[in-house]
């Protein structure tokens, strides 16, 4: 259906208003996709011309985006003053998805906020790990505070650090869009922990104990003191120094914090602060140490020494704060504010969110590595083309409730789509296709010419040849004698193993008589591109159109009616494919 000059002018005028509204309201460039809905909703008479309107709107949007911020506001005030008034009268008070931190005012913060993420560096992060840096980094930005990464690597045996994980985790933090103000490795700070332990002993707050774990557990559960509890400060200091100098074997001696042996919670009764581990630490700087602090002691000391003001930890770790408060009371320190939250569960994956499980599956070959698309890791999401911002936004939306929360991967996909859709060029990719010959009406119809991007016609068109036949997905194959619309080409009718073009116009699609499908050159065609797509459900092979070779490695494209994908490698002759891509999401 032809658009006459009068209708074209009306479309441009309405598009100008909505483009200005979009740009002024969001304080950014207008986007064609963002204004098409309001434009068509306000002008239903435009709908019969839906295919042509984006091209007209695109030119208007480009003109608006060339204007300065002040010019956009001035023009909107001229053509739609009421709309400008509505925008400027909207509540401009900052709203946050996260609740305010305890003791901190959003209007006038009275203290400097300093928070930490304290990972165990035993491997790269899975998706659940992203929640802590996402929330802490967001709070840090909100309050102009500080964000610390502290590697709690003081267990060289049970939770043995992976030397590569330190850098892997920092890369994961950067991927999420944050840069820590400080990076601390607890294994560098043993002498500090020893010094604080000596002070605690002097204050009567700790004693050395050689009871077996089983024997002490029986005494503790009965609320009875172990005989070592009455040791003198001098004896305790002497035996603690012997622990430091390796004069005892693992399991022979520990240092306990003196709490309340009759406390109603047995887990808080005279807990272990230091123990002996014979296994050397993998970091050369810490390999000679054998006397290691337990996490509750090390973490409590570090939180004070580094000025942490607010701690976020799992609801299951409430006892940690209670244990540490005994040490803080001995030193007359003020304990940081604590926010407890529930566990996070992530849908869509068959592999559990467990670093040890992932390590096992990688070692046995079930997974190719940390960035295998089947792995629920940040490295995997990054390789698939998911932006860190999309993950952060999803994590922030979970809040900080004490109840367990379910993270739907669809929320990450939805966020990511907002980041990549406007930039992703479109291509055809056919999986497990069926091949047909195609009889063209003339030499002018030897190729399809779909746009690289429907909202950005200025990017140009692709060229998809049909002369050597086409391939389409099995679900799209019409019954013999039925028609389909080959997107970007024409309406065709099936005749056994052949297709013939018809004289039908686009109105058969608008009226719902004919389905629109994607397609690609036949596999035997010199124009076809063989593609391996790696997905969370396994690898898929298929055929893509020739212009896909124009995409660069790391580009994110959209395979129409299939989903987004990131270009990973090209010219992979060893795999008998022309290209490997990683599926991003629908």
Curated annotation (Swiss-Prot):
GO terms, molecular function: ATP binding; glutamate-tRNA ligase activity
Biased composition (Acidic residues): 85-94
Subcellular location: Cytoplasm
Reactions the enzyme catalyzes: tRNA(Glu) + L-glutamate + ATP = L-glutamyl-tRNA(Glu) + AMP + diphosphate
UniProt motif ('HIGH' region) ranges: 119-129
NCBIfam families membership: gltX_arch, PRK04156.1
Protein name: Glutamate--tRNA ligase
């Amino acid at each position: 259906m032809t658009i006459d000059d009068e209708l074209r002018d009306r479309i441009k005028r309405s598009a100008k208003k909505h483009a200005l509204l979009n740009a002024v309201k969001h304080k950014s460039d207008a986007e064609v996709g963002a204004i098409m809905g309001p434009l068509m909703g306000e002008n239903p008479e435009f709908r019969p011309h839906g295919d042509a309107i984006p091209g007209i709107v695109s030119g208007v949007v480009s003109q608006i985006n060339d204007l300065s911020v002040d010019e956009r506001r001035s023009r909107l005030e001229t053509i739609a003053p009421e709309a400008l008034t509505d925008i400027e009268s909207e509540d401009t008070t900052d709203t946050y998805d996260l609740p305010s931190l305890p003791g901190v005012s959003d209007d006038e913060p009275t203290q400097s906020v300093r928070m930490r993420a304290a990972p165990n560096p035993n491997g790269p992060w899975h998706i659940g790990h992203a929640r802590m840096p996402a929330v802490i980094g967001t709070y840090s930005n909100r309050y102009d505070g500080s964000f610390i990464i502290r590697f709690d690597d003081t267990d060289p045996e049970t939770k043995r650090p992976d030397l590569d994980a330190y850098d892997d985790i920092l890369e994961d933090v950067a991927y999420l869009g944050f840069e820590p103000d400080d990076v601390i490795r607890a294994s560098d700070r043993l002498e500090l922990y020893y010094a604080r332990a000596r002070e605690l002993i002097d204050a009567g707050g700790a004693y050395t104990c050689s009871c077996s774990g089983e024997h002490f557990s029986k005494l503790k559960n009965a609320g009875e003191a172990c005989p070592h509890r009455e040791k003198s400060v001098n004896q305790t200091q002497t035996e603690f120094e012997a622990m430091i100098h390796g004069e005892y074997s693992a399991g022979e001696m520990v240092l306990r914090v003196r709490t309340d042996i009759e406390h109603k919670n047995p887990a808080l009764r005279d807990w272990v602060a230091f123990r002996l581990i014979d296994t050397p630490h993998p970091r050369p700087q810490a390999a000679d140490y054998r006397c290691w602090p337990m996490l509750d002691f090390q973490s409590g000391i570090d939180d004070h020494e580094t000025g942490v003001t607010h701690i976020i930890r799992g609801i299951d770790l409430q006892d940690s704060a209670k244990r540490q408060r005994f040490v803080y009371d001995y030193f007359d320190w003020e304990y940081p504010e604590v926010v407890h939250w529930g566990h996070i569960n992530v849908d869509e994956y068959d592999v559990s969110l467990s670093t040890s499980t992932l390590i096992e599956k990688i070692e046995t070959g079930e997974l190719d590595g940390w960035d295998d698309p089947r792995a629920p890791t940040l490295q995997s999401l990054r390789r698939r083309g998911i932006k860190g911002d999309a993950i952060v936004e999803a994590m922030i939306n979970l809040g900080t409730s004490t109840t367990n929360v379910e993270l739907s991967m669809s929320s990450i996909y939805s966020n990511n789509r907002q980041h990549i859709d406007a930039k992703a060029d479109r291509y055809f990719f056919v999986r497990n296709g069926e091949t047909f010959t195609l009889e063209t009406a003339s030499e002018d119809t030897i190729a399809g010419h779909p746009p690289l991007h429907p909202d950005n016609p200025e990017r140009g068109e692709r060229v998809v040849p049909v002369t050597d036949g086409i391939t389409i997905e099995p679900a799209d194959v019409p019954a013999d004698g039925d028609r389909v619309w080959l997107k970007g080409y024409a309406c065709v009718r099936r005749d056994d193993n052949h297709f013939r073009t018809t004289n039908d116009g686009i109105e058969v699609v608008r009226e719902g008589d004919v389905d629109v499908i994607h397609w690609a050159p036949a596999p035997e065609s010199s124009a076809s591109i063989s593609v391996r797509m790696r997905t969370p459900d396994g690898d898929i092979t298929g055929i893509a159109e020739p212009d896909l070779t124009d995409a660069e490695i790391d580009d994110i494209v959209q395979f129409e009616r299939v989903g987004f994908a990131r270009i990973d490698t090209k010219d992979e002759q060893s795999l008998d494919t022309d290209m490997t891509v990683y599926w991003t999401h629908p």
